[in-house]
Amino acid sequence: MFKCPERVSIKKKEDILDLPNLVEVQIKSYKQFLQIGKLAEERENIGLEEVFREIFPIKSYNEATILEYLSYNLGVPKYSPEECIRRGITYSVTLKVRFRLTDETGIKEEEVYMGTIPIMTDKGTFIINGAERVVVSQVHRSPGINFEQEKHSKGNVLFSFRIIPYRGSWLEAVFDINDLIYIHIDRKKRRRKILAMTFIRALGYSTDADIIEEFFSVEERSLRLEKDFVALVGKVLADNVVDADSSLVYGKAGEKLSTAMLKRILDAGVQSLKIAVGADENHPIIKMLAKDPTDSYEAALKDFYRRLRPGEPATLVNARSTIMRLFFDAKRYNLGRVGRYKLNKKLGFPLDDETLSQVTLRKEDVIGALKYLIRLRMGDEKTSIDDIDHLANRRVRSVGELIQNHCRSGLARMEKIVRERMNLFDFSSDTLTPGKIISAKGLVSVLKDFFSRSQLSQFMDQTNPVAELTHKRRLSALGPGGLNRERAGFEVRDVHASHYGRICPIETPEGPNIGLITSLSSFAKINEFGFIETPYRVVRDGIVTDEIEYMTADVEEECVIAQASAELDEYDMFKTPVCWARYKGEAFEADTSTVTHMDVSPKQLVSVVTGLIPFLEHDDANRALMGSNMQRQAVPLLKTEAAIVGTGLEGRAAKDSGAIIVAQEDGVVEYVDSYEIVVAKKNNPTLKDRYQLKKFLRSNSGTCINQTPLCSVGDVVTHGDVLADGPATDKGELALGKNVLVAFMPWYGYNFEDAIIISERLIKQDAYTSIYIEEFELTARDTKLGKEEITRDIPNVSEEVLANLGEDGVVRIGAEVKPGDILVGKITPKSETELAPEERLLRAIFGEKAADVKDASLTVPPGTEGVVMDVKVFSRKDRLSKSDDELVEEAVHLKDLQKEYKSQLAQLKVEHREKLGALLLNEKAPAAIIHRRSADILVQEGAIFDQETIELLERESLVDLLMAPCDMYDVLKDILSSYETAVQRLEVNYKTEAEHIKEGDADLDHGVIRQVKVYVASKRKLQVGDKMAGRHGNKGVVSKIVPEADMPFLANGETVQMILNPLGVPSRMNLGQVLETHLGYAAKTAGIYVKTPVFEGFPESRIWDMMIEQGLPEDGKSYLFDGKTGERFDSKVVVGYIYMLKLSHLIADKIHARSIGPYSLVTQQPLGGKAQMGGQRFGEMEVWALEAYGVAHMLQEILTVKSDDVSGRTRIYESIVKGENLLRSGTPESFNVLIKEMQGLGLDVRPMVVDA
């Protein structure tokens, strides 16, 4: 058994916490969405279940017919993920939903087929139309409440708040310059503003007294003594003062008490008054009460409606239904659990489950928000404005949630159709059933649209395992409901203090998307509300415990967090009284007694790919960014080699990316070949785990996916052991490049501008050779003119050209092909119009003949050559045209298949019985087991399970068994559920195989008779023009391949394999590459592998010690000798081992030439670009260069016959054919275009011939 090489490290202690599963973001989210494996009654109100419960029940307009949702059921996939890719179909399961319909004729229940739903593979990807895709998680502004401030042109600071729901209208409240608060509903309608006081009344606070009571505490004061009188002057009334007899109003609520008013009140014999404590005439609420044009609930509602819908009659019914619809109808306005959580947290409301389930707006929310806004305006220290770029105010929508939102809109469409069908149904002629009124089209089309067209559903980057892993961990601020890259400012893109341990500050693309597309940090998790959490060790009484606490960004604000590098003694206490810590996003030297938490690892700051860069702490951030991005572009090599200098993350990255095969359980390897590994389970050797290996498959980016076994028969394996290597892995570790002996020196000017010089030895050893696989596809269809045919018999093609084609017209496997060679021969019927006049005449005389077909063969495109490695043919079988022999053969195949199916089913039953026996035999039942439908007691509580009872349970399905919750029931459920799924899968496989034997490939597109896929593999060696890079952002292009004899060599005669330019180091400030060179040299000489984890790597002194130990020069520099002359170079040169990668930007894909080719339709100028077989544009500046040298004839040629002079092109062709060399140019087409454009403007411009 191959074991991963143990890496030497200087870390004294391993990380307290292991990395979480790196693709958990995807898998967990989709699992919660579908809740596969759960019984219908056990499903929580989340994901797909939540959407169905939201939309249903649907009632007809007269409420006589009601359609209720009961449960949904998911089938099993028809094909495996690999088979789906091969056939070009979607990896999905059927969705069946059980409905109950109640109408005047009674109650009917029915299970309705609602189409298919794509499911996720074990690796966290989807297969849509045969291509692997990833749904990227979206970062968006969290629903909830945000308080903001902006400066008015007059210099005043104006405060505002915004309540953002998950779905529905935004509510905004803004202070104006006069200290009045105005409410805006939906940002689009900013001009329609409503005074906050009017809005409060419209919510149901009718009188001024009610409003004052909400905002102020009210005190009752007596008016008996003179000192009471004096104390009340200037206070604000909290209620109207009314004469009980005459109903005369002496003072209104909200009015300021003057001496005159108090005398009138005293004269009327009023004994006490209600006073608003803390209110004065300048208080915003009192000001707004005075300004408010309305005085009652009804008037406020009408005013609100008038401002919202000017021009429409403001009736009370309309106004009330509008406000209800805007904020109090859960279908139209939904804060979501997240929005409610954020709002309650900010305003100090309770956070229990009951409160969090209230998803619409409450009156208390508006009042609470206005109170907070006023406190903010008054300068209360306990209030604060929100930073919208803080991760407490930004959340992540993962796959499950994104698809849930699309399902909601699909089912909402269906709801309208169902309601219409209910109303239009003719009950007299037919009975109504759920299947007759439900249309699954809405849901299916929305899902199809999302997976194939959404900006967040992306074609997976599959260049290498790291690219795949990073793509699944990516966070995007773009996409529907997100930002727009043109409008996104600097603040959104910038690194924020709250990103620490949540979003990687380094890994982001260069260019327009910088900062908008980011990556999750290595330890980050996403919580139930969608906020990113990061783990910390809890510190209690100065002792750093092993207790781990996951914290969101807002919780972290209140904690003092020490760095992971802080030194601890053997009792896990801080060694020093002061250490570096963070508090509210600022770093400072903290007293260790105040520290509350500690980082779990220094690498929690960065993402996985950035964590793969050794000596990251010595690299400039810009170069580290390039290093992270370029590791994703490394091509998997033919011969892989793990890095001598690693960081310790290589094994984990390879494992979680799904590139390698890992043992699921302990056991012994029983059988190994290049296609399959069989492991007998340790606890029950009769049960086998079978692992299928992927052999020479094409990845999304054309690279080769191939897995090779690492184990041998008889090897004992434990859970998590590596059984097989994949692409770009070496003994279970990531291996993207090669360890190369490098010298930093100039060499005859060939490494100018970062160019790289390599030794021919690397080419001979196939060090940087990679395999590319191209897929070519051809379909034969049934056309109007007749059937297309795949055949070897192609008109007007010599036998020599057809040499590699088999009898069926398909190229043989192993054939070497080059551009223009035929891969699949195909003939298509010709239409009459395509025939030449003489052909038509001949056909009229001699009648129909075989030549009425044209050649439509698939040929190798330019720039591609290689070996045909695989051919796949899919075809339909015609039931009616089968011969007797074929029917007999079919019957034999079906019989064999049935036999195999029965034996596998029997094996499953045996395994199932053994599992049940292992769990239950001779055990005591902790609770009774009841049959759900018949209510019979199958097993009494306390009974001992014997063989008979186990056989009884074995025959029952999981749905029918009922037992009180206990550990035994949980395990029993798992066993029954996995057995039922296995039986279902076996049955589906049997039916699929039987269908294939009878009908061939029935899932081909409509009209397709036959489909052929040809795979051509090409071996690409490293050549001049290929791009290479190290892990520190040090990239360059291969400029020269030097014979080994000419390369500089060391004193011991060893030649250098690569020469890099030393000037690439100082200005780029990526010193990591130099340290890697030294450490790599020392480790290679010692024959060890080392790991230098991010921020806790080898110190410089330790590297020098290792160099000296290995007898290498102390300064890391050696004298080199020129391979050409044998003379020693003057200065010492840094020599050592660097891990260099070959990137996917290969010159073979980019180099291009054209003699003649296609021309643009309008301008008649050659097209541009390799894909269009375009030319090289000779632009304005190039013309100036030729003009400067006065090369008139060349200029004329370039601007006319080589470009858009149509008649001149024809004439020059004729003259070249005749052997003349005459250039008679005509009018360039661009001149005619100019004239037409001017005529389009109404100018009569015509070229005229004028006699001289």
From Swiss-Prot:
<dbReference type="Pfam" id="PF00562">
    <property type="entry name" value="RNA_pol_Rpb2_6"/>
</dbReference>
<dbReference type="InterPro" id="IPR007644">
    <property type="entry name" value="RNA_pol_bsu_protrusion"/>
</dbReference>
<dbReference type="InterPro" id="IPR014724">
    <property type="entry name" value="RNA_pol_RPB2_OB-fold"/>
</dbReference>
<keyword id="KW-0804">Transcription</keyword>
<dbReference type="InterPro" id="IPR019462">
    <property type="entry name" value="DNA-dir_RNA_pol_bsu_external_1"/>
</dbReference>
<keyword id="KW-0808">Transferase</keyword>
<dbReference type="GO" id="GO:0006351">
    <property type="term" value="P:DNA-templated transcription"/>
</dbReference>
<dbReference type="InterPro" id="IPR007645">
    <property type="entry name" value="RNA_pol_Rpb2_3"/>
</dbReference>
<keyword id="KW-0548">Nucleotidyltransferase</keyword>
<dbReference type="Pfam" id="PF04560">
    <property type="entry name" value="RNA_pol_Rpb2_7"/>
</dbReference>
<dbReference type="GO" id="GO:0000428">
    <property type="term" value="C:DNA-directed RNA polymerase complex"/>
</dbReference>
<dbReference type="InterPro" id="IPR015712">
    <property type="entry name" value="DNA-dir_RNA_pol_su2"/>
</dbReference>
<comment type="similarity">
    <text>Belongs to the RNA polymerase beta chain family.</text>
</comment>
<dbReference type="InterPro" id="IPR037033">
    <property type="entry name" value="DNA-dir_RNAP_su2_hyb_sf"/>
</dbReference>
<dbReference type="InterPro" id="IPR007120">
    <property type="entry name" value="DNA-dir_RNAP_su2_dom"/>
</dbReference>
<dbReference type="InterPro" id="IPR037034">
    <property type="entry name" value="RNA_pol_Rpb2_2_sf"/>
</dbReference>
<comment type="function">
    <text>DNA-dependent RNA polymerase catalyzes the transcription of DNA into RNA using the four ribonucleoside triphosphates as substrates.</text>
</comment>
<dbReference type="GO" id="GO:0003899">
    <property type="term" value="F:DNA-directed RNA polymerase activity"/>
</dbReference>
<dbReference type="InterPro" id="IPR007121">
    <property type="entry name" value="RNA_pol_bsu_CS"/>
</dbReference>
<comment type="subunit">
    <text>The RNAP catalytic core consists of 2 alpha, 1 beta, 1 beta' and 1 omega subunit. When a sigma factor is associated with the core the holoenzyme is formed, which can initiate transcription.</text>
</comment>
<keyword id="KW-0240">DNA-directed RNA polymerase</keyword>
<protein>
    <recommendedName>
        <fullName>DNA-directed RNA polymerase subunit beta</fullName>
        <ecNumber>2.7.7.6</ecNumber>
    </recommendedName>
</protein>
<dbReference type="GO" id="GO:0003677">
    <property type="term" value="F:DNA binding"/>
</dbReference>
<dbReference type="InterPro" id="IPR010243">
    <property type="entry name" value="RNA_pol_bsu_bac"/>
</dbReference>
<dbReference type="Pfam" id="PF04565">
    <property type="entry name" value="RNA_pol_Rpb2_3"/>
</dbReference>
<dbReference type="Pfam" id="PF04561">
    <property type="entry name" value="RNA_pol_Rpb2_2"/>
</dbReference>
<dbReference type="InterPro" id="IPR007641">
    <property type="entry name" value="RNA_pol_Rpb2_7"/>
</dbReference>
<dbReference type="Pfam" id="PF10385">
    <property type="entry name" value="RNA_pol_Rpb2_45"/>
</dbReference>
<dbReference type="GO" id="GO:0032549">
    <property type="term" value="F:ribonucleoside binding"/>
</dbReference>
<dbReference type="InterPro" id="IPR007642">
    <property type="entry name" value="RNA_pol_Rpb2_2"/>
</dbReference>
<dbReference type="Pfam" id="PF04563">
    <property type="entry name" value="RNA_pol_Rpb2_1"/>
</dbReference>
